[in-house]
């Protein structure tokens, strides 16, 4: 469905009711939404499950913030083929990014660009499938801890065009311990605050709960 209308300047807080064993509601679920729908300036705070999840479709999302999601911050499924541009991820409970490959006969490539991620207590940085298809660029990670990593670079039918990753590692950290399977090739270690890629936080600080409460001061 091509979609119509818009969702803008919305803060979604403390959602994610449990509707079954291991089945909670995402903060924002975009299922088969088309590129004719405008989704921009979205904040998801303290959701029980994923922050934003895409199931197919071609919708584009810009200026988004996911803060303290109980599960993954950003989750893509079923050959979503849109773009996520200019976003911040803060302290998810599981993966910062869970980027799945197409299912069945579906195909498509999505783009994730211009993001800043504070990993905090996350279980992992990026989790990909063998068949994930995406362009992944201009990302900055900080607040990274031992045990968090970027793994499973697509090796089967998948496609990964990744570039311009920067990370601030913990003291004594080794890049290849965090960015594995060749992902260190497109990642550069930088001092905190010295990043030259990532999100433009200024468009989020003035209206989001995270910004108004002072929790984006380091961004």
Q: What positions do the PLM features span?
A:
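Extracellular beta-rich repeat passengers
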Residues: 1-219
């Amino acid at each position: 469905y091509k979609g119509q209308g818009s969702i803008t300047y919305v803060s979604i807080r403390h959602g994610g009711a449990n509707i079954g064993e291991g089945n909670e509601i995402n903060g924002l679920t975009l299922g088969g939404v088309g590129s004719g729908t405008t989704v921009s300036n979205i904040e998801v705070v303290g959701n029980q499950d994923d922050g934003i999840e895409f199931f197919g479709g071609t919708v584009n999302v810009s200026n988004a913030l996911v803060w303290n999601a109980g599960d993954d911050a950003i989750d893509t499924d079923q050959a979503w083929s849109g773009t996520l541009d200019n976003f911040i991820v803060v302290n998810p409970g599981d993966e910062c990014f869970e980027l799945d490959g197409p299912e069945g006969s579906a195909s498509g490539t999505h783009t994730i660009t211009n993001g800043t991620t504070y990993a905090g207590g996350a279980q992992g940085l990026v989790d990909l499938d063998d068949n994930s298809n995406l362009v992944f660029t201009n990302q900055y990670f900080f607040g990274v801890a031992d045990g968090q990593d970027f793994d499973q670079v697509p090796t089967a039918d998948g496609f990964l065009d990744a570039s311009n990753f920067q990370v601030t590692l913990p003291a004594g950290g080794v890049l290849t311990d965090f960015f594995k399977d060749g992902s260190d090739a497109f990642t550069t270690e930088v001092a905190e605050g010295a990043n030259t890629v990532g999100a433009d936080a200024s468009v989020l600080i003035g209206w989001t709960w995270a910004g108004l409460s002072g929790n984006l001061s380091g961004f």
